[in-house]
Structure formats: C-alpha cells, structure tokens
Amino acid sequence: MIKGILFDLDDTLYNSSEFVEIARREAVKSMIDAGLNIDFEEAMNILNKIIKDKGSNYGKHFDDLVKAVLGKYDPKIITTGIITYHNVKVALLRPYPHTIKTLMELKAMGLKLGVITDGLTIKQWEKLIRLGIHPFFDDVITSEEFGLGKPHLEFFKYGLKRMGLKAEETVYVGDRVDKDIKPAKELGMITVRILKGKYKDMEDDEYSDYTINSLQELVDIVKNLKKD
C-alpha cells in the first residue's frame, strides 16, 4: 500500500534549468554594464567554470568572477550581479503547469508528501515558498541539513525516516537517473522519472518503474498503485 511520495525539487516541480541559465546571463550583462571590462561570452565561460569547480550551491560565484577579471574585489559590480540574478529569478520562478493541481489531488488521497533535495536549506525553502507549493509538503529534507546529498543512499534513508515511511510504501519522483532514480530504486522505492530539464535525455535502462512527461500523469499511476 502506497502511503507517501518523495519529490525531487529542481526540474521536477518547476523548470530550474531554464530560469537559472537566464538569470545568470542577465546578471553577467548587468555586471558588464556596471564596469566589468570583459566580453560577455568570455565572462560566461569563466562563470561556468567557477560553477563547475565550486558547485552550484557555492555562495560567491560572482565574487570569484569579478576577481578573475579585475584581479580585485569590487562590491558595486558584485552587488549589481546579485540583485539582477535575484530579480530575474523572482520574475521567472513558476511551477510546471500541472504541479499545483497534481499536489492537491495527491494530498486529497491522504498521502504524505515530502521534498528531498540537494542544496542549501534556506535557498530550497525560498524556492518552495516563492513557487507557492510549500503548504502541500509534510517535510522538506535538504542535503545541507544531513551533511550528505544525492546519490548517497544514507540521505534517502534519512528522508524516509523523517517522513515515517518505508521504502516499499513510497513513490519517488525525480528527473535524474543517476542522482534520483537509481538510488531510490536500490532502496526499494517505486520510481517515477519525469522527463524534464537538462537531464531528460539521460539513458535509463532499468531504474525507472514509470516515466512521465507531465506531473499530471502521476495521479493515475498512484491511483493504480493504491489499488494493489
């Protein structure tokens, strides 16, 4: 009997890949306008290397970009980039079209709903609140809280424990095979892969019990599972 669902957040409940890329590009443009003396594409290459080396949750991407270009710290240019990034993020941050309706229907079935996500706790909560979907979830589990992230099995076990669920009575929904679907499947959860975001073309031969193009498809899957 299915008792709960764990969701990934980024590119599962909203389009993370698109808004982040647009926000970063607009931030760099604003920094150049504020005095960062560099070609736009060259600046983006440097920024993307910083993000790759330091990780997406590193808090000083723009600081490092300015230091790499100017050889010094410039608070005006850095702050310009930060403000532009956040303004664009707020303007673009929207749930996928069927996210809210799907969460409402699942909640009406009496299921426990949780989010398990890599990232800084405050950042991930900010996204959930801005998306307007935080009231649907019984718990939100972040890698920052636990100290390890995906694909570590212990992180997923911790999430199940926090939710008071067993793996075999839990559906897991995510977009990435390597970080979401594979570890969830290895623990015995029923896995649903949503084909969204930059990893939608990632090969998956054995780990997804179901694949969906829209969250709306999840409702019928769960209804059928609850019959078993």
Curated annotation (Swiss-Prot):
InterPro entries: HAD-like_hydrolase, HAD-like_sf, HAD-SF_hydro_IA, HAD-SF_hydro_IA_CTE7, HAD_2, HAD_sf
Keywords per UniProt: Hydrolase, Magnesium, Metal-binding
Cofactor requirement: Mg(2+)
GO biological processes: small molecule biosynthetic process
EC number(s) given by UniProt: 3.1.3.-
Pfam family, one: HAD_2
One Gene Ontology MF term: phosphatase activity
Enzyme class (EC, first level): hydrolase
Family: Belongs to the HAD-like hydrolase superfamily.
Function comment: Catalyzes the dephosphorylation of D,L-glyceraldehyde 3-phosphate in vitro.
Protein name: Glyceraldehyde 3-phosphate phosphatase
